[in-house]
């Protein structure tokens, strides 16, 4: 569970992981019921924040729901090795939803972890720029530490107002299969909990 406090010490958000790992010790946990966003007032202004925890990032729907609920920044506490494919998931969640994704991970001194905390700002193109840019604005190493990244929220908002990803051209009426609860081969698992 993630608990987010604002700079004044007020609890703003409590989020319980929706996608618990049914194939491991997390099978004994109760999954969360929903994804939430909250307006977080910072010294630089307000930003709409949501959260996913670790395995939630494996499901594009997690970030998409948060985007639809207004998230501009998704916080992602993590506890597993951050390798190229997991980093690619985070980059994709930021790109496809035009939002920032900030991940903190346990350092390499913790078993089965390797640090690699990151921030993707979600802005793939800059006005007047030539081609796309790398949205990764922070990639930490394996050591324990406090890592800071500057997120230009106004730039993100301008980008969201002009570009084509996110909710700009979706056709949700054609996505009925996404809410179908049936699971077919080859994806049936004995450990799955609905």
How does the language model describe each region?
Residues 57-147:
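CN hydrolase (nitrilase-like) catalytic-core segments centered on the catalytic cysteine
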Residues 2-4, 13, 29, 40, ...:
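Generic detector of leucine side chains in alpha-helical contexts
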Residues 107-194:
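C-terminal beta-strand edge segments of enzyme domains
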Residues 18, 78, 97, 163-166:
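Alpha-helix boundary/capping residues
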Residues 1-69, 78, 82-92, 113:
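Active-site catalytic loop in hydrolytic enzyme cores
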